[in-house]
Amino acid sequence: YKAVRTIEKCPVIAVPAKGREHAVSYRIAAGMVDNMEEKEYLDLDTPMTKDRQILNQNYEKAAKRIIEELEKGKDVAYLTLGDPTIYSTYMYIQRIIKEKGYETSIINGIPSFCAAASKLNESLADRADELHVIPSSYDIRNALRYPGTKVLMKSASRLAEVREILKEKNVDVKMIENCGMADEQI
């Protein structure tokens, strides 16, 4: 419960959404942390785009808002889903904050694909098996040639296309959407 204790101690919570009520990470934290209503919030909207210039501008803007709070002597907790080191917007913002000389720390989470494997009662890799984590918002055709288990992440925006590719390649697939949440689908 290191994450819960950290959120309880931090007076400012950064939420990666237009409004915290839209953030799954906020709803999860609010169910675990008693004093969430006492917090100040930074709603840090990051657009879903591959345009590096737009993304970098948003990362800089988010880092600036967090640094403003740090300059006031306040600690800030940034909410993420899963593990912040795997395809998380936080890592881009964290690098900027670190480069500006501020101390940061990361509390590991449970990667969604590990939670999904547990839910399915399946191993991701045994002995010498390879495990490949692939962002399916990019071209997955080449990645499907890799040996071992392939985990396709971030596929929501291209789900129909991903399904077609998997069907075409006759790949054995197991899928969980919103693993561990009320609207989970297997």
Question: What are these model-predicted stretches?
Answer:
Residues G73-A77, E130, T149-V151, D172:
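Residue-level preference for the first positions of well-ordered beta-strands
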Residues Y41-D43, T104, V133, V173-M175:
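Conserved beta-strand scaffold positions in the cores of enzyme catalytic domains, especially
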Residues L144-I186:
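A contiguous loop/helix-start segment that scaffolds small-molecule binding in enzyme catalytic cores
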Residues D45, L79-L81, I134, L152-K154, ...:
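Short beta-strand segments
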